[in-house]
Amino acid sequence: MPTTQQSPQDEQEKLLDEAIQAVKVQSFQMKRCLDKNKLMDALKHASNMLGELRTSMLSPKSYYELYMAISDELHYLEVYLTDEFAKGRKVADLYELVQYAGNIIPRLYLLITVGVVYVKSFPQSRKDILKDLVEMCRGVQHPLRGLFLRNYLLQCTRNILPDEGEPTDEETTGDISDSMDFVLLNFAEMNKLWVRMQHQGHSRDREKRERERQELRILVGTNLVRLSQLEGVNVERYKQIVLTGILEQVVNCRDALAQEYLMECIIQVFPDEFHLQTLNPFLRACAELHQNVNVKNIIIALIDRLALFAHREDGPGIPADIKLFDIFSQQVATVIQSRQDMPSEDVVSLQVSLINLAMKCYPDRVDYVDKVLETTVEIFNKLNLEHIATSSAVSKELTRLLKIPVDTYNNILTVLKLKHFHPLFEYFDYESRKSMSCYVLSNVLDYNTEIVSQDQVDSIMNLVSTLIQDQPDQPVEDPDPEDFADEQSLVGRFIHLLRSEDPDQQYLILNTARKHFGAGGNQRIRFTLPPLVFAAYQLAFRYKENSKVDDKWEKKCQKIFSFAHQTISALIKAELAELPLRLFLQGALAAGEIGFENHETVAYEFMSQAFSLYEDEISDSKAQLAAITLIIGTFERMKCFSEENHEPLRTQCALAASKLLKKPDQGRAVSTCAHLFWSGRNTDKNGEELHGGKRVMECLKKALKIANQCMDPSLQVQLFIEILNRYIYFYEKENDAVTIQVLNQLIQKIREDLPNLESSEETEQINKHFHNTLEHLRLRRESPESEGPIYEGLIL
């Protein structure tokens, strides 16, 4: 029967299991011999156990498990030997003896174990033995076996390396220099073994070998950790000996994986103070690394670490004599120059880190931030980059770069000091420019940054011009209406931040803003011009407040209303009618309230313009009713007109109301007009209400007549009730023309018509309205002590 082939994983498990079983058997025998003080037999079993490490069949992961199991057993031997030597057994003999072990792997592991015990028992032999051991390990040149052997050497000697502050005879016991040499040599040899791993085996297994190398990297990196733990390694020794030795090995090995890992290792394991003193050599080495090394990540890791160090509240900060930004700026430029094939997004990533460094370490140096932006512009020019696509990696990095100053300063005026911010902004394509413009304006709004001069307005408008005017590179199809409205609303809100303490300066600001917004096209100006008009009206009120200190305030107000008129006219040209109508009405109100020279003429002109728009541009019946109601309501509030101007305007309102297309609309509008003849005011009566009772009655009678002409019974009754409420209003305002008899007749008419209506939800609402009206009259009739006329003779 054929045997099924095992998977590589199953095979590994089987091989490892067999090796572990052999280790257990040999370690049991070793311990048994040690318990009986049979040292030579114990060493023989230890050698057999260590023989398992000679295998080439195990993967690094499996080999590591085997190595750990054997290391634990060797610890038992080490403890035993330490006790024996303490009792007086000769170590030197044993050290000589284990060198005769048959195979090199068991021999060297035993030598290290005995050697460490020897040093602990006789410290004066330390220098020679350490040198001896690190040299002897060269005997194993198989990458995997050699790496683990040297790792064992490093682990065992951890606590016996000479360091600062030890009272010793340096001639024989060694000093900190010997420790540095020992670890550096071990590191160099381990790195060579690690690099050599890639050349073993078949080329088709390259990816697998790379994965295995990744798994083993920590063994090499441990050497650097050990160096960083030596107290005797101060800044000077680090600069002169340690870093020089490490970088020499890193650069010379010409292996991308090793170089990238070890450079990152250096950054992580050594203190910030050391990095600050060795920036130039470290960054120079970065420029010499293999082309496949992602240098960007290495430099960014160092920059980010030092930026954090500088930002730490409890830290000493960056020493004044170290020009951190300048060093990084120059060295990063060198690295970019040395790597012509570096991806554009990586180049920008480096600039992102530089700008972060400038912001955190030198928050007051706007020039440093601008220097980074300038460098980026120069790089883009060299690369001939134009209109970077939104979806590209470069665009994402450039967005990060430009958002940093916006988010850090939270003040657009500081951002505008960066001369190269706008030129860099222009490298984006349409979508990215639009999105960044929204981001900038949102920041201005979030932090309520006031824009106080014409130049600032110009600069910001030019920066976010994608939101304000059509662009040559914008898509042909129309934008999504909701998104467009959101973007333009941002711009509209931004207008309210154009505020100068000086009213004259404010006028210039509004003029500048209008130049930009005026070129925005019909779709945009409906969002952007109305806030500008309101800002103009507010400015006119400010001039009124300053009238005592500014003798030209009236002329300035006329100028402002002329500005508003022109701005509203632009909206009319864009074929918008309701919006400019409302703005004209608002302007008429403002002119009337402010009361400057010629204000009546201005207010009349604005009212006339509103009427013209109503008559010429608004055709929808619903919109017409809303518009005439607005005109009547606005006019009723105004008291700046003489009778000469007031009379034609109120007559015009009544005429327009009676010409509405639908009868119900006519009825409602005409009854609303009644208020103009009662509470309307003009200058001939010193601002007192007209109280033209007769004209009020004419309007209400006309409204009733129109209601009678309605074909829909329920609509007719509804109008009667609404007109009844108007009659009641004027009766309570003591209009003599409205009598109890008139009220009784109308109530009687409604009572007769109501039962004839078909049962429906609408009828229910009409009944409720009528009931509430009668309830009001009942309460007034039963409370004669309340103010207002008495309802005597009212039939309910």
Swiss-Prot record:
Residues 25-44, 205-215 are annotated as: Interaction with SNX3. One of its GO terms (molecular function) is D1 dopamine receptor binding. Ubiquitous. Highly expressed in heart, brain, placenta, skeletal muscle, spleen, thymus, testis, ovary, small intestine, kidney and colon. It is found in: Cytoplasm; Membrane; Endosome; Early endosome. The keyword Protein transport applies. GO terms for cellular component: cytosol; dopaminergic synapse; early endosome; endosome; endosome membrane; extracellular exosome; glutamatergic synapse; intracellular membrane-bounded organelle. Pfam families: Vps35. Coiled coil: none annotated. It is linked to Parkinson disease 17: An autosomal dominant, adult-onset form of Parkinson disease. Parkinson disease is a complex neurodegenerative disorder characterized by bradykinesia, resting tremor, muscular rigidity and postural instability, as well as by a clinically significant response to treatment with levodopa. The pathology involves the loss of dopaminergic neurons in the substantia nigra and the presence of Lewy bodies (intraneuronal accumulations of aggregated proteins), in surviving neurons in various areas of the brain. Component of the heterotrimeric retromer cargo-selective complex (CSC), also decribed as vacuolar protein sorting subcomplex (VPS), formed by VPS26 (VPS26A or VPS26B), VPS29 and VPS35. The CSC has a highly elongated structure with VPS26 and VPS29 binding independently at opposite distal ends of VPS35 as central platform. The CSC is believed to associate with variable sorting nexins to form functionally distinct retromer complex variants. (Microbial infection) Interacts with human papillomavirus 16 minor capsid protein L2 (via C-terminus); this interaction mediates the transport of the capsid from the early endosome to the Golgi apparatus. Acts as a component of the retromer cargo-selective complex (CSC). The CSC is believed to be the core functional component of retromer or respective retromer complex variants acting to prevent missorting of selected transmembrane cargo proteins into the lysosomal degradation pathway. The recruitment of the CSC to the endosomal membrane involves RAB7A and SNX3. (Microbial infection) The heterotrimeric retromer cargo-selective complex (CSC) mediates the exit of human papillomavirus from the early endosome and the delivery to the Golgi apparatus. This is Vacuolar protein sorting-associated protein 35. The gene is VPS35.
